[in-house]
Amino acid sequence: MVINSIINKKKIPLYGNGKNIREWIYVDDFINAIEFLIKKAIPNQTFLIGSGYAEKNIDLINKIIKIIKKETEFKIEKNLIKYVKDRAGHDRVYKINSNKIRKLGWKHKIQLNDGLLKTIKHYI
């Protein structure tokens, strides 16, 4: 949504003050984790898949903007962010404990900034 908003020169909606924290994982890492678990064939178990990269939403948006400015010739408008009222009871942090899958030997491969760059290049 952030990249599409930038491409289409639309405001990026950011809930609350932007300091909510979310964990991020590159899609290829997520797929690799699913394939890893299928091959392990462990029945009746639940596994949480995560990268361990947790960022404030505002920081992630700023990273995306910085990468687009550095890696592309795309012109970025000023004042891109539109702060939106947060919903009542919105969780401040979404971060998981993926130790269970890590103990089996799985680990993400794509670093956050590398994943952001790959995603941006896909869209632009």
PLM features: residue spans?
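C-terminal substrate-binding subdomain of Rossmann-fold SDR/epimerase-dehydratase oxidoreductases
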Residues: 3-124
